[in-house]
């Protein structure tokens, strides 16, 4: 029983180590008016794991910080596309 408890306790402490926060920049060229960034920001903020979004109309981009254990770039681009604003990873 002690070994089981020790194993579970160790797993609980090790699991968060594998999760990492990432920040990516998405190109969102379809934003054509000042209210577009509001829609894009709302769509991205609804994705589980997203902790911060900064959407710029002037640069036509979104900078997104997220937990890569909960989401990924594909889910972020799908969220913007579903909101009517296709995006891609900016390199």
Curated annotation (Swiss-Prot):
CDD domains: HMA. It is found in: Periplasm. SUPFAM superfamilies: HMA, heavy metal-associated domain (SSF55008). GO terms for molecular function: mercury ion binding; mercury ion transmembrane transporter activity. Residues 22-88 form the HMA domain. One of its GO terms (cellular component) is periplasmic space. InterPro entries: Heavy-metal-associated_CS, HMA_dom, HMA_dom_sf, MerP, MerP/CopZ. Its main location: periplasm. It holds the Pfam family HMA. Keywords: Mercuric resistance, Mercury, Metal-binding, Periplasm, Plasmid, Signal. Residues 1-19 form the signal peptide. Hg(2+) binds at residues 33, 36. PROSITE patterns: HMA_1, HMA_2. Belongs to the MerP family. Monomer. Involved in mercury resistance. Acts as a mercury scavenger that specifically binds to a mercuric ion in the periplasm and probably passes it to the cytoplasmic mercuric reductase MerA via the mercuric transport protein MerT. This is Mercuric transport protein periplasmic component. It comes from Acinetobacter calcoaceticus. The gene is merP.
């Amino acid at each position: 029983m002690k070994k089981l408890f020790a194993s579970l306790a160790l797993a609980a402490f090790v699991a968060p180590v594998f999760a990492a926060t990432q920040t990516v920049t998405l190109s969102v060229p379809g934003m054509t008016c000042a209210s577009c960034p509001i829609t894009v920001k709302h769509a991205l903020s609804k994705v589980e794991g997203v902790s911060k979004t900064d959407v710029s109309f002037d640069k036509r981009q979104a900078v997104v910080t997220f937990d890569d254990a909960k989401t990924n770039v594909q889910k972020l681009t799908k969220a913007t596309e579903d909101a009517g604003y296709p995006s891609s990873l900016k390199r």
